[in-house]
Each structure stands twice: as structure tokens, then as C-alpha cells.
Amino acid sequence: MPSEFAIAADPLLGLIQIDMSGFFLEADIHAFEEARNKAHSQLRCGPNEHLTLVDIRSMQIQSQEAVAAFKCILDNPAYKSKRIAIVVSHTLARMQIQRAAVNRDVMYFSEDLLVARNWLLNGCI
């Protein structure tokens, strides 16, 4: 399954919402990073004050190279979010994103996007 992603910025909430699916190749990851950077330029909050909601329920298991590339993206201090909520469905995908997001304030949610969004915006489940 080829990769697909959608990234939307909500400047009023200081929120970046990311939906990802499929299997990511190197070119897909570069396109994702460019789109993420463009979405960040729409935010009005201060640096590193935004929130990020990521839905990877439809994402396939990724190669080790892809996991490493996503880790580099997540480790970029210029785009580091205050909090990240990640909605996952597969155990292995969850383990992969945990490796990629090891240095971040992340909460993981199984299948429930609304619970994840509530935690992100209100700080509680």
C-alpha cells in the first residue's frame, strides 16, 4: 500500500493534525517533512507551544530506515511540539513509533481519536 498523508494546521488551537497510512519510502518521508514544515508556518503560537495529533491507525509496519528517518524528523528542535497524541492500532507500529518518539512527551491511544484529542487539548483523559 503506497503512503498517504494529510497535515492540517488549526492556528486558533495551535494544533497540527496528521493522518498517515501505507508504507513510506525515502521520497515519501521527504514530502511529509516538507508538508509538515508548511503546516507549521500557519501556526500563530510561539515556538514549540503547538500540539500535535497523529493518526497512524492505517499505517503499515515501516522499514528500519523509515523509522530512523521519522526519528530524525521528530528530533528536530525547531518543530518540537509541546505534546503529541498518537492514535495507533497495530502493536508493532506502536513499538516503532515509540522508538522514533523516544525523546518526546507522547501519549499513545488505541483506536480512539476523540479521547486522544481531548487529552491533547485539555491535558486529561
Where is each model-derived feature located?
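Amphipathic, Lys/Arg-enriched alpha-helical "gate/interface" segment within cytosolic domains
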Residues: 1-125
